[in-house]
């Protein structure tokens, strides 16, 4: 079987719509997830909470050290809006033409889904050093001296490993780049996500706004 959406026309489509449909590879992951869920006695299969939609008006903007963010979901928002989405932290980020995000690291892994634009990431990967000292309260991490470069475009998904220092760059001088950042809430609840967040460099827009 070829591409299941081949032949579908996208009139006036955005760049992301033209790119994400590429590829013929298929899988049955969802059916496997469903089968395992039905066999799980602890899984809930009821109607669940009623408030399941967040509107753009519910999602606040923030000009942060990491850049311009539009928060889609986090623990504080879930409590304020009586929203059941407690499993993930998500925000959209917009990087102006020719600019870049701040540079930071957090203990939890992250997935970045590119919606618009093109650019690259710099990643300084982290290695956990085992010293044998049983009384050490915090693990010791060593970071690469030079970053690895990963180019991306609309439709791509970028994986940011645990504790990796990273920074996003928009290579277009005309168009903004926009992506969604997702991090599992479990890391945060265990103290391994945004509870362990370190900023090394601020986005230019944040610095100019100070």
Task: Indicate where each model-derived feature is located.
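A short, N-terminal "cap"/entry segment at the start of jelly-roll beta-barrel domains
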Residues: 1-86, 194-199, 206-210
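Double-stranded beta-helix
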Residues: 2-25, 129, 133-136, 142-143, ...
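Conserved short histidine dyad/triad with adjacent acidic residue
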Residues: 74-76, 89-106, 125-128, 162
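Short acidic-glycine-tyrosine-enriched beta hairpin
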Residues: 113, 126-162
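A structural connector/turn signal
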Residues: 90, 100, 109, 147, ...
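Short beta-strand His + acidic residue motifs that chelate non-heme Fe in jelly-roll/DSBH
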Residues: 101-104, 121-122, 149-151, 160, ...
């Amino acid at each position: 079987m070829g591409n299941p959406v081949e032949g579908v026309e996208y009139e006036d489509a955005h760049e992301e719509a033209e790119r994400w449909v590429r590829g013929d590879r298929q899988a049955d992951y969802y059916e496997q997830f469903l089968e395992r869920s039905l066999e799980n006695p602890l899984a809930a299969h009821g109607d669940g909470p009623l408030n399941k939609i967040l509107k753009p008006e519910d999602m606040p903007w923030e000009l942060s050290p990491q850049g311009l963010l539009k928060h889609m979901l986090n623990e504080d928002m879930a409590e304020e809006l009586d929203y059941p989405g407690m499993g993930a932290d998500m925000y959209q980020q917009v990087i102006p033409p020719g600019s870049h995000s701040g540079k930071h690291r957090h203990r939890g892994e992250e997935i970045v889904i590119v919606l618009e634009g093109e650019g690259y990431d710099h990643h300084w990967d982290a290695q956990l050093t085992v010293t044998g000292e049983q009384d050490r309260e915090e693990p010791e991490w060593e970071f690469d001296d030079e970053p690895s470069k990963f180019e991306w475009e609309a439709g791509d998904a970028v994986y940011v490993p645990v504790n990796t220092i990273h920074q996003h760059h928009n290579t277009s001088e005309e168009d903004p780049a926009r992506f969604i950042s997702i991090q599992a809430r479990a890391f945060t609840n265990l103290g391994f996500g945004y509870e362990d967040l370190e900023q090394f460099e601020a986005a230019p827009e944040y610095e100019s706004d100070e």
